[in-house]
A protein has these predicted regions:
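Short beta-edge/loop segments at beta->alpha junctions of small alpha/beta modules
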Residues: 1-82, 181-196
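Short coil/turn segments at secondary-structure boundaries
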Residues: 25, 83, 97-100, 170-173, ...
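Hydrophobic alpha-helical interaction segments
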Residues: 30, 134-245
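Short linear loop/turn motifs
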Residues: 42-44, 55, 98-103, 221
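Residues in well-ordered beta-strands of folded domains
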Residues: 55, 101-103, 121, 235, ...
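Long, compositionally biased
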Residues: 67-71, 116-119, 205-212
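Exposed, interaction-prone assembly regions rather than primary DNA-binding/catalytic cores
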Residues: 81-140, 145
Length: 245
């Protein structure tokens, strides 16, 4: 019995999820060479987003599929900090055009085809004693298939606090901490124990105590890496920040 081989174009339209961009290697895996991809673009069957990145016509790239593609390019890429808290519903107000906060293990930059559609910032950050292939408390958003990697709210909080005095105001951080009454103390404890930033650990304890949050009473400061007995001091646009051990 004769069999009919499916054309590469039909394979692309059958397998590709809505809103998903494609890299050149994805096309090659479907039997679409670089020359054939050029032909498809000229024929209007593919849209070129940038060199080596394509999407289907009349199928605008969606955020999660785009992040999944970037995760293959930037080791340890995930939604973190203020954005992670926002995704988990922990926010003080809704920004008109929020800036997506992305963190990763290595230095790099976000391509313009992505940032033109989704305003975002990428920062290399190694805040915990961990490996990029097994990031602590980072996983698919809401455990959904084909969802981007995002920090758990406990990790998002510490990533946010690590930015205080750099790209994050202390006042806004304090306001956000006030909304974290539902954080899991055991998860926060594990992250704090493996946190490499003395400032972040001290600031978490200070703001937790100031807000009388439920999780603070379940943490033992004596077991956490708070550094030496000397105060941690930093000057920013907001003034002098002094964190006692």
């Amino acid at each position: 019995m004769a069999t009919t081989k499916q054309s590469p174009l039909k394979t692309l339209n059958t397998l590709l999820a809505p809103g998903a961009p494609l890299a050149s290697e994805d096309l090659a895996a479907m039997g679409i060479s670089a020359d054939l991809a050029v032909h498809y673009v000229r024929a209007g069957w593919l849209t070129r987003l940038a060199r080596g990145v394509f999407c289907r016509p009349n199928d605008p790239p969606a955020l999660h599929p785009c992040l999944l593609l970037l995760q293959r390019k930037l080791e340890g890429l995930h939604v973190g900090g203020r954005s992670a808290l926002d995704w988990h519903g922990l926010r003080q107000y809704v920004a008109q055009q929020p800036m997506l906060q992305l963190y990763g293990w290595t230095a790099g930059h976000l391509p313009s085809w992505f940032t033109d559609r989704f305003p975002a910032e990428y920062h290399r950050k190694r805040l915990f004693d961990e490996r990029p292939e097994t990031l602590l408390h980072v996983g698919p958003f809401e455990q959904r298939s084909r969802a981007a990697q995002v920090s758990a709210p406990e990790r998002g909080l510490l990533e946010l606090l690590s930015e205080v005095g750099v790209r994050q105001s202390l006042q806004e951080a304090g306001e956000l901490v006030e909304s974290t009454y539902s954080l899991r103390a055991d998860v926060l404890r594990e992250l704090l124990e493996r946190c490499t930033s003395v400032k972040t650990v001290r600031l978490c304890l200070l703001l937790g105590q100031k807000g009388s949050l439920p999780w603070i009473s379940k943490l033992d400061p004596a077991t956490l890496p708070k550094g030496s007995d000397r105060p941690w001091v930093s000057r920013s646009a907001e003034g002098l920040l002094v964190l006692k051990p």
